[in-house]
Amino acid sequence: MNRTRLDDHLADLDPDGFLLDASQEDANQLYLSGFTGPDPFLTLYADGEVHLLVSGLEYGRAQTEATADTVERHADYDYEYGGREERTDMYAAFLRDKGVESVSMPPRGPIGTADALRERGIEVAVDTDDRLRAVRAVKTDEEIDAIRDAQTANEAAMRAAEELIAGADVAAEGDDAEAGVLLRDGEPLTSERVTEEIE
């Protein structure tokens, strides 16, 4: 992540921070946090730093994998189980601990989170320009290298799968396998075996 570019794009926003409430499925969340959390978690970007708030279940992994400056868990805010109200109380406390009284959220951010934070005195504005997406669109040299490495690995995996399938025979009448089944080394060539070759 290019923090200088991010700061430049967020500089004209009035709020104290930029907040995401999403899982790894959200490209902005993955980009900003560097964490592949399957369940939604909070990422706050404020004063040039990235702060995460994750469940206790994901805490250890987030500490080692995330690119955040700080990682905190729900239990740090006396929340482990509870409903929406308690969860949002925790969110507001997390923001205030970081000196944040106002946030900008992306246009696809959860309205439930935004409304509940407003009820707790946190100002929430929607970043209708989706600035984080614009930052993600321009890759750093390191990101370009990572994309290139991933592409090379994917191409090698596909070549291996193609070779496995190309080297297979088709079962005929009288073979141990049903006619028309692909065989490799005398055994049916299953999707699981192809997947193993790819991985």
Label each PLM-derived region with a short phrase.
Residues 92-199:
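Flexible, acidic/His-enriched mid-domain "rim/lid" segments that flank
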Residues 1-94, 139:
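N-terminal accessory/capping or targeting/presequence segment of soluble
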